[in-house]
Swiss-Prot record:
Domain named SMB: residues: 28-66
Record-given protein name: Sushi domain-containing protein 2
Pfam families in the cross-refs: AMOP (PF03782), C8-3_MUC4 (PF23263), Sushi (PF00084), VWD (PF00094)
Gene: SUSD2
Stretches in topological domain Cytoplasmic: 807-822
Its job: May be a cytokine receptor for GPR15LG. May be a tumor suppressor; together with GPR15LG has a growth inhibitory effect on colon cancer cells which includes G1 cell cycle arrest. May play a role in breast tumorigenesis.
Domain Sushi: start-end pairs: 723-780
Bilayer disposition of the protein: Single-pass type I membrane protein
C-alpha cells in the first residue's frame, strides 16, 4: 500500500473498529504472513499499537529484534523479542534474509528465538522472515539493519593492534609479531578459530559478469582458548592465495568447520594484506609495489572516465559543512573527532558526496585545511581524491563497483598503497585521482521555517503564518519532491492554548522513496523519527541507508535527510517547536511551490496560490493567513502519520486547515511593560523573537526563535557563492607560494637556482574568475634577482671598505693630537 493512501485506510479502519482494542485473533484475524497489512478485521501495520487495533498476535509475527543492527559482514546473533517458544527442543529455526539467504537460528534455554545475520554485499534495511518448522513456512517477518564495517562499534569486532603495522608489514623496518584483540563476551565460547577471508571482484569491469566475492582462504589458528588476544609471526601465504590483496580476519567458535558461512563471528576491519604477501614483496617491496601500481595504471586507462559525472566540490570548508544535502562528513577525516586524517596529511576535515554517481557508482571527496582552504592533489599528496567506487556503496549494491567499502578498497585504497605508501610513485596515482577545484560549484538554496511559525523562503521573503493544520511546505514536480508539516498551538504557562502555532511534525518523500517523518515526541520533547509510519530506534546506529535517501541523527536533537536529487532537510528541536531547513540544488530553479515560495530569484512571486494567482508584496497578515490556508495537505496525498486517536480525530477526521482557530496577528500583540522590557533586551531588532514572546508570553520561546533565526542567517552566510579561478600551476624549474585560488588570493612565483623569471612575479584571482597574470616561465641563466643581489652586494662591500678606511684615518689623526697633551 502506498503511504499516500494510508490516511484513507486508517480512516476506514478507525471507523470500523472504533477507539478500542482489536478483536481476538483466529485464522482470519492473525498477522501470520500479513505484517504491514491494514486490511482485514484487525491491523498488522505499525500504527496499530497506538490505535489499539492490532491483531492479538501482532508481536508474535511482526518481529522486534535486539540488537537490530550489525556489520554487513554478518555473524551477529540477535534475539526475537516478545516471543518465546513453549517447547524449545522441538523447534528447527531457519532465518531467511531477502527471500534467498538462509541462516540457521536456534532457541535458547529460556525459549527465546535467535537468528544470525548473514554475510551481505550491501548496507541498509534488510527484510527477513523466520521459520520454526525447518523451512516449510516463513510466517514471521522483521527488518535487520546491515551496517558499513567502519560504522560498527569496537565491541562488535576484533581490533588489529597497530593497524598501520599490519598494512605495512614486509616493508622497510616493519617485521616481527602482529597482534589482534577482541571482547570475549562478544563471542561466548571456550575455544575459537581465527580465519583469513579475502575479497575480490572478477569479470570484465562494468559488464554483467563483473561479480564480487568474499572467500575463505586459510586459518591462522584453530582450537585456541578464547582469551581476547592473539599474537603470531606472519609467513608468506602459498602462491594459490597471493591473488587476494585485501581481506579481513574472522573469529568463530571452534565447533564450526573451517570457512562455514553465516555463523556467529567477530570480524576485523577490512585491510591491505601486506602481512600475507609473497617473498617477492618482502625481498623488494618497493619494486613489487611499483609493478602493481603500473598494472593498476594500465587498467585505469582502459576503464571509463568516471570523473565527469561527479559533483563539484564546495570551495570552502564552511560551504562543505553547510551543504548537508549533497555532502557529509568523511569519518576518516573528521574535525569533530580530532582530525585524524591518515590518508590526507595537511587536512583537518573531509566530506564525501552523499550520493554515488548514477552511471558508475563513483564518489567525490573534498578535503580542507585549518583555514578552510580546499586541499588539492596538484599541490599536496594529502589532497582530496575522488573514488571509482564510493566508500559507502551505491544502490542496488551487491555488484561491483557498488559494494560498500570493498569496491572502494579495491579500486581506490589498495592502489594508494601500491603507488603512494609502498612505493614512491604517488604522482601516478594523483594523475588518475585528481581533486576537483570547485570552479563549477554552485551552493544550494536555503529556506527555513521555525518558531511560531515563521517562514523564510528560498528567495528571501519572510512572513508569519499561524495556521492550525497540515500544510505543504514544498512541492517540486521535477523530482516529485514533497515536504509537508503539521502545525499545532503552543501552551501558555497557565495551561491555556496560545493563539500562535508551531511545527510539530515534518514529513518528506521524493518519487517512490521511503517516507520519513520527524516529529516532537510527546513524552520527552525530543525528536521521534518514523520510516513509512514506523517509529525508528537510534540506540545503536545514527546513520541509515534508506530507499532513495540517507538519514543521520545527531545527539538526538537534529535529523538530517539527504535525498537522491541532492536536496536536503535538517530538522531540529528549538524550544517547544520544530525548526526545519530545506536545501535545494540549482536544478530546482523555477520548479518549487508551497509555503517556502517559488525558487526563481524573484521574491515578489513567493506568495503564489495553488491556482497560480500571486499575492503582491506588502500583502496584509490577514491575506497571508489565507495564502497559508491555501496550501493545506489533502488526505489522499498526506505523508504524515496518524497513530493515535488524538491525531485521527483532530487531523484525519477534521479539515486539514482548522477554520475555527483564531490566530494572533502582529497588530494584535501586546506585552505588559516588564515583559516588553525584557523582550526588547532579549530580542533586539529580531521581530520574529519579539512576536513569539508576545504570542506565548515566554522568553524561552523567544530565545529559541532567535537562535533558530540566527542559525538560518549563519547558514545563509556560509552558502554565499565565492569565485574560484581554478588551480594555477607553478612554472617548470620553479615554485609557487600559496594554495588558495579564490577571488582576492595572490600566488607568488620563484625560479630555481640557475633560472630567471620571465613574466609577473605574482598573479591574483580576480572577481571575474580569471588570473591577473598567467604562470610565468623560468628561463636558463642567472635570475635578475640574483644579478641585482651580486651587484648591490659588491657595492655594499666597496662602501664598507671605504668607510673603514676613513674611520682608521681619523683615528690615527686623533691619536697624534692626544699624544701632545700634558
Amino acid at each position: 500500500m502506498k503511504p499516500a493512501l494510508l490516511p484513507w485506510a486508517l480512516l476506514l479502519l478507525a471507523t470500523a473498529l472504533g477507539p478500542g482494542p482489536g478483536p481476538t485473533a483466529d485464522a482470519q484475524e492473525s498477522c501470520s504472513m500479513r505484517c504491514g497489512a491494514l486490511d482485514g478485521p484487525c491491523s498488522c501495520h505499525p500504527t496499530c499499537s497506538g490505535l489499539g487495533t492490532c491483531c492479538l498476535d501482532f508481536r508474535d509475527f511482526c518481529l522486534e529484534i535486539l540488537p537490530y543492527s550489525g556489520s554487513m559482514m554478518g555473524g551477529k546473533d540477535f534475539v526475537v523479542r516478545h516471543f518465546k517458544m513453549s517447547s524449545p527442543t522441538d523447534a528447527s529455526v531457519i532465518c531467511r534474509f531477502k527471500d534467498s539467504i538462509q541462516t540457521l537460528g536456534h532457541v535458547d534455554s529460556s525459549g527465546q528465538v535467535h537468528c544470525v545475520s548473514p554475510l551481505l554485499y550491501e548496507s541498509g534495511r534488510i527484510p527477513f522472515t523466520v521459520s520454526l518448522d525447518n523451512g516449510h513456512s516463513f510466517p514471521r517477518a522483521g527488518t535487520w539493519l546491515a551496517v558499513h564495517p567502519n560504522k560498527v562499534s569496537m565491541m562488535e569486532k576484533s581490533e588489529l593492534v597497530n593497524e598501520t603495522r599490519w598494512q605495512y608489514y614486509g616493508t622497510a623496518n616493519t617485521s616481527g609479531n602482529l597482534s589482534l584483540t577482541w571482547h570475549v563476551k562478544s563471542l561466548p565460547t571456550q575455544t575459537i578459530t581465527i580465519e583469513l577471508w579475502g575479497y575480490e571482484e572478477t569479470g570484465m569491469p562494468y559488464s554483467q559478469e563483473w561479480t564480487a566475492k568474499w572467500s575463505y582462504l586459510y586459518p591462522l589458528a584453530t582450537h585456541i582458548p578464547n582469551s581476547g588476544s592473539f599474537t603470531f609471526t606472519p609467513k608468506p601465504a602459498p602462491p594459490s592465495y597471493q591473488r587476494w590483496r585485501v581481506g579481513a580476519l574472522r573469529i568463530i567458535d571452534s565447533k564450526n568447520y573451517a570457512g562455514q558461512k553465516d555463523v556467529q563471528a567477530l570480524w576485523t576491519n577490512d585491510h591491505a594484506l601486506a602481512w600475507h604477501l609473497s617473498d617477492d614483496f618482502r625481498e623488494d617491496p618497493v619494486a613489487w609495489a611499483r609493478t602493481q601500481c603500473q598494472a593498476w595504471e594500465e587498467l585505469e586507462d582502459q576503464l571509463p572516465n568516471f570523473l565527469e559525472e561527479l559533483p563539484d566540490c564546495p570551495c570552502t570548508l564552511t560551504q562543505a559543512r553547510a551543504d548537508s544535502g549533497r555532502f557529509f562528513t568523511d569519518y576518516g577525516c573528521d574535525m569533530e573527532q580530532g582530525s585524524v586524517c591518515t590518508y590526507h596529511p595537511g587536512a583537518v576535515h573531509c566530506v564525501r558526496s552523499v550520493q554515488a554517481s548514477l552511471r558508475y557508482g563513483s564518489g567525490q571527496q573534498c578535503c580542507y585545511t585549518a583555514d578552510g582552504t580546499q586541499l588539492l592533489t596538484a599541490d599536496s599528496s594529502g589532497g582530496s581524491t575522488p573514488d571509482r567506487g564510493h566508500d559507502w556503496g551505491a544502490p542496488p549494491f551487491r555488484t561491483p563497483p557498488r559494494v560498500p567499502s570493498m569496491s572502494h578498497w579495491l579500486y581506490d585504497v589498495l592502489s594508494f598503497y601500491y603507488c603512494c605508501l609502498w612505493a614512491p610513485d604517488c604522482p601516478r596515482y594523483m594523475q588518475r585521482r585528481p581533486s576537483n577545484d570547485c570552479r563549477n560549484y554552485r551552493p544550494p538554496r536555503l529556506a527555513s521555517a521555525f518558531g511560531d511559525p515563521h517562514f523564510v523562503t528560498f528567495d528571501g521573503t519572510n512572513f508569519t503564518f499561524n495556521g492550525r493544520g497540515e500544510y505543504v511546505l514544498l512541492e517540486a514536480a521535477l523530482t516529485d519532491l514533497r515536504v509537508q508539516a503539521r502545525a499545532q498551538p503552543g501552551t501558555m504557562s497557565n495551561g491555556t492554548e496560545t493563539r500562535g502555532t508551531g511545527l510539530t511534525a515534518v514529513a518528506v518523500q521524493e518519487g517512490n522513496s521511503d517516507v520519513v517523518e520527524v516529529r516532537l515526541a510527546n513524552r520527552t520533547g525530543g525528536l521521534e523519527v518514523l520510516l513509512n509510519q514506523e517509529v525508528l530506534s537510534f540506540t545503536e546506529q545514527s546513520w541509515m541507508d534508506l530507499k532513495g535517501m540517507f538519514l543521520s541523527v545527531a545527539a538526538g536533537d537534529r535529523v538530517s535527510i539527504m535525498l537522491a536529487s541532492g536536496a536536503g532537510l535538517e530538522v531540529s528541536v528549538q524550544g517547544p517547536f520544530l525548526s526545519v531547513s530545506v536545501l535545494l540544488p540549482e536544478k530546482f530553479l523555477t520548479h518549487t511551490h508551497g509555503l517556502l515560495g517559488t525558487l526563481n530569484n524573484d521574491p515578489t512571486d513567493d506568495f503564489t496560490l495553488h491556482s497560480g494567482r500571486v499575492l503582491p508584496p506588502g500583502t496584509s497578515p490577514q491575506e497571508l493567513f489565507l495564502f497559508g490556508a491555501n496550501w493545506t495537505v489533502h488526505n489522499a496525498s498526506s505523508l504524515l502519520t496518524y497513530d493515535s486517536w488524538f491525531l485521527v480525530h483532530n487531523f484525519l477526521y477534521q479539515p486539514k486547515h482548522d477554520p475555527t482557530f483564531e490566530p494572533l496577528f502582529p497588530s494584535e500583540t501586546t506585552l505588559n511593560p516588564s515583559l516588553a522590557q525584557e523582550a526588547a533586551k532579549l530580542c533586539g531588532d529580531d521581530h520574529f523573537c519579539n512576536f513569539d514572546v508576545a504570542a506565548t508570553g515566554s522568553l524561552s520561546t523567544g530565545t529559541a526563535t532567535r537562535v533558530a533565526h540566527q542559525l538560518h542567517q549563519r547558514r545563509m552566510q556560509s552558502l554565499q557563492p565565492v569565485v574560484s579561478c581554478g588551480w594555477l600551476a607553478p612554472p617548470p624549474n620553479g615554485q609557487k607560494e600559496g594554495n588558495r585560488y579564490l577571488a582576492g588570493s595572490t600566488i607568488y612565483f620563484h625560479c630555481d637556482n640557475g633560472y630567471s623569471l620571465a613574466g609577473a612575479e605574482t598573479s591574483t584571482c580576480q572577481a571575474d574568475g580569471t588570473w591577473s597574470s598567467p604562470t610565468p616561465k623560468c628561463q636558463p641563466g642567472r635570475s635578475y634577482a640574483v644579478l641585482l643581489g651580486i651587484i648591490f652586494g659588491g657595492l655594499a662591500v666597496v662602501a664598507a671598505v671605504a668607510l673603514v678606511y676613513v674611520l682608521l684615518r681619523r683615528r690615527k689623526g686623533n691619536t697624534h693630537v692626544w699624544g701632545a697633551q700634558p
